From Swiss-Prot:
Positions of transmembrane segments: none
Organism of derivation: Homo sapiens (Human)
Name of the featured protein: PH domain leucine-rich repeat-containing protein phosphatase 2
Gene3D superfamilies associated with the record: PPM-type phosphatase domain, Ribonuclease Inhibitor
Feature: compositional bias, Basic and acidic residues: 1292-1315
UniProt gene name: PHLPP2
Source species taxonomy: Eukaryota, Metazoa, Chordata, Craniata, Vertebrata
Membrane topology, as annotated: Peripheral membrane protein
Biological processes per GO annotation: hippocampus development; intracellular signal transduction
Role description: Protein phosphatase involved in regulation of Akt and PKC signaling. Mediates dephosphorylation in the C-terminal domain hydrophobic motif of members of the AGC Ser/Thr protein kinase family; specifically acts on 'Ser-473' of AKT1, 'Ser-660' of PRKCB isoform beta-II and 'Ser-657' of PRKCA. Akt regulates the balance between cell survival and apoptosis through a cascade that primarily alters the function of transcription factors that regulate pro- and antiapoptotic genes. Dephosphorylation of 'Ser-473' of Akt triggers apoptosis and decreases cell proliferation.
Boundaries of every PH domain copy: 150-248
SUPFAM superfamilies: L domain-like, PH domain-like, PP2C-like
Length: 1323
């Protein structure tokens, strides 16, 4: 293959051919670089919605260059005839590559940091043109017209100076740059005199006498004016738009941020009046024409922003700009500062956040006017001593550094410091050098550290303390000046404040281990907000509830059983009592708390409610009432209507059977009503009087009549799913406000086409779709089913989407997903539509669940294209598939997630979390990774102020802080796995794993279960988008893939054994395929096995049983059929019952001959058979077997068992009898009788002399109450079914005739997917 200049770089190609691909396969260090030209940039800027692949394919100047990871940019430039190569990340900034940089290695490193591990896969991804949305190379620097307009406008136009007609029009070069209009004195020449017209504070006017003309005027009494005439309307509008921004400014500010600049525009130096220059997010160079070394030319410059320029070294020449008062140099990779910085004597604000600084120079202390110094997210291990000299500073802002010790003595020496911000450090201990009090520090922020004990009692002037998300066990403070205390998410058992904080207004002690409310909090006279939720409180002090200043009290998630009775009137406005153990509320609650507007008493045990009326008239001002998940009955309804100002009422999951029409009629202010999860049969017709009602949620009831809600003028959301609706009465005109109508789960509801046409204007109409029978769905429908619920809450749009495929990958698996875009709906919908296809492709390429799941997320991240550059989404994907890697399981569940969506598995009634929450607050490792990458984490815990997530799909512009690599977990599914819950962030913020599992594990319908979860979240205070999916799992015997499923087990030839068979209890799992073998292996004990004759409940089994040569490998068992332990018998009793009812009534005298080796007692036959045996490794080498072996199935095979027939020598051979196609088909019919061919007089198809060694058939199993089965009396030994060698062909012929002569009835629905079990019954 021809190379260009070097063996490392090949000629450019316009497409991939076979020769190029062969060359790439030879070495993973080879690859290609897509090179975009200038015309490609135009296509990209004009078509913002097209993907990278489409734009690249349509571009005439796009081509690829084959190269290696060692090929430098200079070599590619030489081969392409270019001066430089340019790199663009995420469709944003463009920087020039250095000649020594290696483009292909840059791509490989980028993909590796995203999460790709396999070098071959990295090579493959690098050749994908879709990657251009994240990383691309240009042969020329792209020029975006809209950005150029904001930097500089220029052209040759007709110009006239002055307002009068004395001057003539003449063609001149006109430039608009910075704050000035520049007009040359000579046409198309800048060598002559340049006329400068400052525009700040001036004005721009339209010249009416001349088309497309503007008049530019400067400010002041001596204002000058220039008239400029443009040729086109587009030019006229561009100049007018940009000039209007300049003249509207009060100060001379130039914003050139995010323009990929390497130097200052030449014409900008004409604007000598510039005072503030913003150059952040560029690639400014230090030493080059127009670089940072020329900024000293701006003689009046006061403010300079050079953040995010990746300078690496501090530009020393900046220290010569003595006029600077503000300087921002954050996120530039500085490791130290020069001593010359002390020359900036006028500097007042210096921002150095996001660098690698460990010390500050002493010369910084010369800046006596410095009042703000930001050194957050650096590498300081202690507070710099220079703070003591900077007396104008009043704040120590050092968030995100490496401090491990809090030395209060250092702070005591800084008398000028009032605010201390040390959040997100590594603080573990605190040092107090002396007992001297500190009277100057008023605000301290110690969030997200590792403190276990904190004593700040020496800070007697402390007004506000943030110490949340530590590991505090005890907290001691001074209460002289304390006004606000945030101490949530710790392990506090004691909080000591002395003296009583008389100025305290806000106290947050939530999510701790407090057993009582501190006494000092009860005595605080000005406290307005108290949050002690998520603690261990058992009682509420009277003084707290009776406080005359308290406005908001949060007591949720405690163990409170009673509330004190109110005696005096209180000003309480918000009361949260959810998740306690309350059985009643104080009788005087509503009569004494007249200002109460919000009450949440959900998840308690309330059976009644206090009256809202003190006399004949109600004075209640209650507006929001949440009483979900209690024990309320119809008797509470008359009490509720006393709250005439109710706007939101939640009564879900109670015991309501009726809602009196006369009572609902009184709630005229009602806007939202939730009655779901009750036993209502109707909604009163008086609901039509609730004219302000916009939301009605009444799912999971017994409603059969559609309520009269379509006449409400403001109705928007109606949820009547999971009811008994049969028809809908539609008015003549539907309300235009109706946006969402949910009628799913009403199995008897049939909507005509006319009705659907009327509902066509509704944005979201949810109805049941009748599924079409498919072969794929019948395979997996037995194993799992799902229900989905999504609610917008108080938001205007739904930004949560879900993916649900019960039949996936040709019907052998299932895929479920949840996507949460937070504030955007585009990305969740894109992922909903594309992620399953990506998974299917990846599954075909790899069988490793970690590999194909990770690649699914990474490829989906790439496929988001331009939409994923600025937007992001949390993603959760669950894949159920047959477990081929683990022979001990039937199905495996693989879960992958990024962001805050989570999946929880219910196993044996207990929750098993399968996901990881990638957020700064809940994942310290991820928070440290983001800190190490020098991201700026704002006070609300968001990366660069955008998102709290550290891993997402999309948001590529936040790379490398935000990554798409998912957390992956796999678990084998067992019979104990009941259901799987998928939910977004809002769901899990308001429901614990245990509560979610307990709330739905007994709900029969998965749709109703998902609805219930969303309703609970909303009733618990969720106002955001909430989404929940519940997947019911039915992994039983029919899902088994081990060698025990449907197999018969041999016993030693001629080894007669008997067991006394007793009645057994009904299995705990009512599935017809719930595994007799597995039940026996766990239930049988030594006392249950009789040893009258030939009992094998001893070690004699090894001597008389199978030869060890017949066991080439260990048995492959699943959780449904575990391997017997030493405490269990190796041989287990069969579930077969042997009856003589199959024999003819008229028998010959030969029928009375006794069977040798079988002992009967007149009523029972004791038989022991081994039903656990290994499958032969190679069935193909077995001797010839009978093609069609008869099988006996009871008509109700849900309670019976079917037994396969083994040849007489099959026990010795260790091989199982394979079933033919005919036998399998006949086996599905529950009405198929025992025999295929003609029976002899003794009920067998073989002579008696050949029928003494094998049991013939097994009849229906009686109800089992113990480990034994009672057999019919008078067992006839001739009823054994034998197939000797010499009659095999005759047996096959007779069975075939029998099968052809009988019609196979239609099987039951449950029998289609649950084939009967089979066991060998050889003695």
């Amino acid at each position: 293959m021809k190379r260009n200049g070097s063996r490392n770089c090949l000629n450019r190609r316009s497409r991939f051919g076979s020769r190029e691909r062969d060359w790439l396969r030879e070495d993973v260090k080879r690859g290609c670089v897509y090179l975009y030209g200038a015309d490609t940039t135009t296509a990209t800027t004009t078509t913002t919605t097209s993907s990278s692949s489409s734009s690249s394919s349509s571009s005439s100047d796009l081509h690829l260059v084959l190269c290696t990871v060692e090929t430098p940019a200079s070599e590619i430039c030489a081969g392409e005839g270019r001066e430089s190569l340019y790199l663009q990340l995420h469709g944003d900034l463009v920087r020039r590559l250095e000649p020594t940089e290696r483009p292909l290695q840059i791509v490989y490193d980028y993909l590796s940091r995203l999460g790709f591990d396999d070098p071959v896969r990295i090579q493959e991804e690098a050749t994908n043109p879709d990657l251009g949305c994240m990383i691309r190379f240009y042969g020329e620097k792209p020029c975006h017209m809209d950005r150029l307009d904001r930097i500089l406008l220029s052209g040759i136009y007709n110009v006239r100076k002055g307002k009068t007609q004395l001057h003539k029009w003449a063609e001149r070069l006109v430039v608009l740059c910075g704050t000035c209009l520049i007009v040359s004195s000579v046409k198309d020449c800048q060598t002559g005199k340049m006329h400068i017209l400052p525009l700040v504070g001036g004005k721009i006017e339209e010249v009416k006498r001349r088309q497309y003309s503007l008049a530019f005027s400067s400010a002041g009494a001596q204002a000058q004016t220039y008239h400029v005439s443009f040729e086109t309307l587009a030019e006229y509008q561009r100049w007018q738009r940009q000039a209007s921004k300049v003249v509207s400014q009060r100060i001379s500010t130039v914003d050139l941020s995010c323009y990929s600049l390497e130097e200052v525009p030449e014409h900008l130096f004409y604007s000598q009046d510039i005072t503030y220059l913003n150059l952040r997010h560029n690639f400014m160079q230090l030493e080059r024409p127009g670089g940072l070394d020329t900024l000293y030319k701006f003689s009046q410059l006061k403010g300079l922003n050079l953040s995010h320029n990746k300078l690496g070294l501090f530009p020393i020449l900046l220290c010569e700009i003595s006029t600077l008062t503000e300087l921002n140099l954050s996120c530039n990779g500085f490791h130290d500062l020069p001593s010359q910085i002390g020359n900036l004597l006028n500097l007042q604000t210096l921002c150095l956040d996001g660098n690698f600084l460990t010390t500050l120079p002493e010369e910084l202390g010369n800046l006596q006017q410095l009042s703000s110094l930001g050194i957050s997210f650096n590498n300081f291990s202690q507070i710099p001593e220079v703070y003591e000299k900077l007396t104008m500073l009043d704040r120590v802002v050092m968030a995100g550094n490496c401090l491990e010790v809090l030395n209060l003595g250092v702070l005591n020496r800084m008398n000028h410091i009032k605010h201390v911000d040390l959040r997100m450090n590594h603080l573990k201990t605190m040092v107090i050098e002396n007992l001297e009090g500190n009277k100057h520090i008023t605000h301290v922020d110690l969030r997200d550290n590792r403190l276990t004990d904190l004593d700040l009692s020496s800070l007697c002037s402390l007004e506000q303390l943030h110490c949340g998300r530590n590991q505090l066990r005890e907290l001691t403070l001074s209460g002289f000046s304390l006004r606000t205390l945030y101490a949530s998410s710790n392990r506090l058992t004691a909080v000591n404040v002395y003296p009583v904080p008389s100025l305290l207004t806000f106290l947050d002690l939530s999510r701790n281990l407090l057993e009582c409310v501190p006494d000092w909090a009860c005595e605080a006279k000005k406290i307005e907000v108290l949050d002690v939720s998520y603690n261990l409180l058992t009682e509420v002090p009277v003084r707290i509830l009776s406080s005359l200043s308290l406005r908001k009290l949060m007591l949720g998630h405690n163990h409170v059983q009673n509330l004190p009775t109110l005696v005096e009137h209180i000003p309480l406005e918000v009361l949260d009592l959810q998740h306690n153990a309350l059985t009643r509320l104080p009788d005087t609650l509503f009569s004494k708390a007249l200002n109460l507007r919000y009450l949440n008493a959900s998840a308690n045990s309330l059976e009644s409610l206090p009256s809202a009326c003190t006399g004949e008239e109600s004075l209640s001002m209650l507006q929001l009432l949440y009483l979900t998940n209690n024990l309320l009955t119809d008797q509470c309804i008359p009490v509720l209507v006393g709250h005439l100002h109710l706007r939101i009422l939640h009564l879900a999951n109670n015991q309501l059977q009726t809602f009196p029409a006369s009572k609902l009629n009184k709630l005229e202010q009602l806007e939202e009503l939730n009655l779901s999860g009750n036993k209502l049969k109707t909604i009163p017709t008086t609901i039509a009087n609730c004219k302000r009602l916009h939301t009605l949620v009444a799912h999971s009831n017994n409603i059969s009549i559609f309520p009269e809600i379509l006449q409400l003028p403001q109705i928007q959301f109606v949820d009547l799913s999971c009811n008994d609706l049969t028809e809908i009465l539609i008015p003549e005109a539907l309300p235009a406000t109706l946006q969402d109508l949910d009628l799913t789960g009403n199995t008897n509801l049939v909507l005509e086409h006319k009705t659907l046409d009327i509902f066509s204007h509704i944005t979201t109409l949810k109805i049941d779709q009748k599924p079409l029978p498919t072969t794929d769905s019948t395979v997996t429908s037995t194993f799992w089913s799902h229900g989905l619920a999504e609610m917008a809450g108080q938001r205007n749009k739904l930004c949560v989407s879900a993916l649900a495929m019960d039949s996936f990958a040709e019907g052998v698996g299932a895929v479920y997903g949840m996507f949460d875009g937070d504030r955007n709906e585009e990305l969740p919908r894109l992922l909903q539509c594309t992620m399953a296809d990506v998974l299917l492709e990846e599954v075909q390429q790899s069988t490793n669940d970690t590999v194909f799941m990770a690649n699914t997320f990474l490829v989906s991240h790439r496929k988001l294209g331009m939409a994923g550059q600025k937007l992001g989404s949390s993603a959760l994907l669950c894949y159920i598939r047959p477990d081929t890697a683990d022979p001990a399981s039937s199905f495996s569940l693989t879960v992958a997630n990024v962001g805050t969506c989570q999946a929880v598995l219910c196993r044996g009634g207990k929750p098993v979390p399968l996901s990881k929450v990638f957020s700064l607050e809940q994942d310290p490792e991820e928070a440290q990774r983001v800190k190490d990458q020098k991201a700026i984490i704002t006070e609300d815990n968001k990366v660069n102020g955008v998102t709290c997530c550290t891993r997402m799909l999309g948001c590529t512009y936040l790379y490398p802080w935000i990554l798409p690599k998912p957390h992956i977990s796999s678990t084998p599914l067992t019979i104990q796995d009941e259901l799987l819950i998928l939910g977004n962030k809002a769901l899990w913020e308001h429901l614990s794993y245990t509560e979610a599992v307990n709330a739905v594990r007994h709900v029969q319908d998965p749709l109703a279960a998902a609805k219930k979860l969303c309703t609970l979240a909303q009733s618990y205070g969720c106002q955001d988008n909430v989404g929940a999916m519940v997947v019911y799992l039915n992994i039983g015997e029919e899902g088994c893939t081990c060698e025990m499923n449907g197999l018969t087990l041999p016993g030693p030839v001629g080894f007669a054994s008997t067991t006394t068979i007793k009645d057994a209890p009904k299995p705990a799992t009512p599935s017809s395929s719930s595994g007799i073998a597995s039940e026996f292996s766990s239930e049988m004990s030594t006392s249950e096995v009789s040893s009258e004759v030939g009992s094998t409940a001893s070690d004699e089994h090894n001597a008389g049983g199978l030869d060890t040569a017949l066991l080439p490998r260990p048995e492959r068992r699943c959780s449904l059929h575990p391997t017997p332990t030493s405490g269990l018998f190796q041989r287990q009793p069969s579930s077969a019952t042997f009856s003589s009812n199959q024999s003819d009534n008229g028998l010959d005298s030969d029928d009375d001959q006794p069977v040798e080796g079988v002992i009967t007692n007149g009523s029972k036959v004791e038989v022991e058979v081994d039903i656990h045996c290994c499958r032969g490794r190679d069935l193909e080498n077995s001797p010839p077997l009978i093609e069609s072996s008869p099988t006996l199935c009871s008509e109700e095979h849900a309670r019976g068992s079917c037994f396969g027939i083994r040849r007489q020598n099959s026990v010795n051979s260790g091989m199982l009898l394979p079933m033919s196609k005919d036998r399998m088909e006949l086996q599905k019919s529950p009405s198929t009788s025992c025999l295929y061919g003609k029976k002899l007089s003794n009920g067998s198809i073989v002579p008696l002399e050949d029928s003494l060694n094998l049991i013939e058939v097994a009849t229906e199993v009686p109800k089992r109450k113990t480990g034994y089965f009672a057999a019919p009396t008078q067992m006839e030994p001739e009823d054994q079914f034998v197939v000797p060698h010499d009659l095999e062909e005759e047996v096959k012929e007779q069975m075939k005739q029998h099968q052809d002569s009988r019609l196979e009835p239609e099987p039951h629905e449950e029998d289609r997917t649950e084939p009967p079990e089979e066991f060998d019954t050889a003695l």
